[in-house]
Swiss-Prot record:
Underlying gene: hrcA
HAMAP family: HrcA
Protein name: Heat-inducible transcription repressor HrcA
GO MF terms, alphabetically ordered: DNA binding
Keywords: Repressor, Stress response, Transcription, Transcription regulation
Cited PANTHER family: HEAT-INDUCIBLE TRANSCRIPTION REPRESSOR HRCA (PTHR34824:SF1)
Domain of life: Bacteria
Function: Negative regulator of class I heat shock genes (grpE-dnaK-dnaJ and groELS operons). Prevents heat-shock induction of these operons.
Amino acid sequence: MMNMLSDRKKLILKAVVENYSQKRQPVGSKMLTYLPYLKFASATIRYDMVQLEKEGFLQKNHTSSGRVPSFKGYVYYLNHLLTRDHDVACMFESIDKVIQKKRFCKGQVIKEALNLLNNLTNYTTMAIGSDIFNNSKITKIDFIPLNSAQAVILIITDKGNVQHQNISLEQTKEISIYDLKDVVQVVNDLLKDKFLSEAAHIIQSDFFKKTIAKYICFQEQLIALFMEAFSSFASENLYFSGVSKMLEKPELNNPEIIKKFMGLLERKELLKIMLNQDSLSFKFSDGLQLTPLKDCMILSIPFDVNPNEKGRIAVVGPSWMKYPKVIPILEYLAVHLSKLNDQE
């Protein structure tokens, strides 16, 4: 049903998205009549815009007679209507120069490429250099008591990665350090030989909650502890560039929102959005309850870290970002980062 728009409606939706992206002003039917590929009467365009609004692809701006894209409209545009801007090819030479800096290790090349992507798009950029989440299995979860109220939990993977989490029972009288040791043993048996991505799903499942139901007073803390550890594994190769670019946006001109956004980055929660995607993907803030931004989106794409592992690069910006420009730059960068394997 989503793909059953008439050709005329598709052209109008595409025009609204791209016009709004460029001018950041609600789009009216009269404005669209000046476009060379929309040779229709203003009344015809206006009628179709009303229909697109009723179907949820456009929405009315209360301060103007024009319309702006809805999240549904953006999704349809990205899946069916996007055309790449070939003029961005002039920027590819600067990407090639970064990729060809053989004196840098791969991690440094990724950082340099990320800084360049930030400069080319003017948006916050980030990368995960290795998809540890999908390629590393848990070999052991160990419990080390420090005293009667404190302990350390170690999570070890088959790739030799280790994360530790401190745990305190000082304010929990319903469970002892010995009970906790038993719980961790149960978790170890449950997650051993599981990929970190599988383990993350298990930890958040109803099945897991039932398994440790006996210790319900400590359930939420335990789940949060393991999820933080899993995110920490992935963040070992996490890079950011241009965070200040997001803080310059008018929507973030609020101390409370800035605090939430910085906390989002510090807690590595954006990792959960980027992981487990095997192609160019996008997430809008209406489906991202963890982001404090109203009109935010994350556009990400995988690249080969080595023949067996994938990383991801991403752009974090407003929903009205210039997709015809940003996407081909992102795709070109991903392809050429993947080619680093051929040079080793």
